[in-house]
Amino acid sequence: MCLSLLKRIFLIHFSIYTWKQSHRLLLLECLMSRSYLLNLHISNHFHPIDQHLVHCLSLCTIQKMI
């Protein structure tokens, strides 16, 4: 539930901004990844708001795996 809610928020945020295709692909890769450290590493290249969303998504993914 936590993960799907954050994904919805993320998609709304995603649609507000137009990014380069490569940036989008990195972002999607980040969302699909189950590696928390990889997410943090990739998210360093994002806008601070995006970094926060990726961080929240990562935490939700970890909780889901436990």
UniProtKB/Swiss-Prot annotation:
* Highest rank taxon of the organism: Eukaryota
Give additional notes from the record.
Completely overlaps MKK1.
Entry protein name: Putative uncharacterized protein YOR231C-A
